């Protein structure tokens, strides 16, 4: 069994920069928070490597939506960071109403470089019932 203590705090700059890159559809330096060999599991996604994560998110977001991520709370447990927020999804298709699902994300920090994320596990939604 592993026990971690968490501190509720303001979201760090690296996390805000990553969300901004997604919201602005720039996908640039905000992704430098990931280790080169990071793994991302969002729902059923299994994306490998910093560049794989960047490109897969670009493909997903560019399929017809604009997003805005809001931080609701952030918990720092040292090697594990937990984020809860809301994402507003505005679709390019005017027939689709915007949605604002809850998101929860776990960021496991790299053992050799604790400033980098080695694994990102998260979920968004549901977006409808």
Protein language model regions, located:
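A beta-strand edge to alpha-helix "cap/lid" segment located at domain peripheries
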Residues: 2-5, 10, 17, 41, ...
């Amino acid at each position: 069994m592993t026990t971690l203590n968490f501190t509720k705090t303001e979201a760090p700059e690296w996390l805000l920069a990553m969300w901004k890159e997604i919201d602005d559809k720039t996908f640039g330096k905000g992704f430098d928070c990931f280790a080169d060999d990071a793994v991302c599991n969002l729902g059923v996604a299994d994306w490998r490597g910093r560049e794989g994560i960047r490109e897969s998110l670009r493909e997903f977001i560019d399929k017809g939506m604009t997003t805005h991520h809001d931080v609701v709370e952030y918990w720092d447990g040292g090697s594990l960071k937990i984020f809860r927020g809301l994402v507003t999804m505005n679709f390019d298709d005017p027939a689709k109403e915007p949605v604002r699902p809850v998101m929860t994300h776990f960021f496991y920090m790299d053992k050799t470089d604790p400033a980098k994320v080695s694994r990102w596990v998260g979920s968004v939604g549901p977006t409808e019932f």
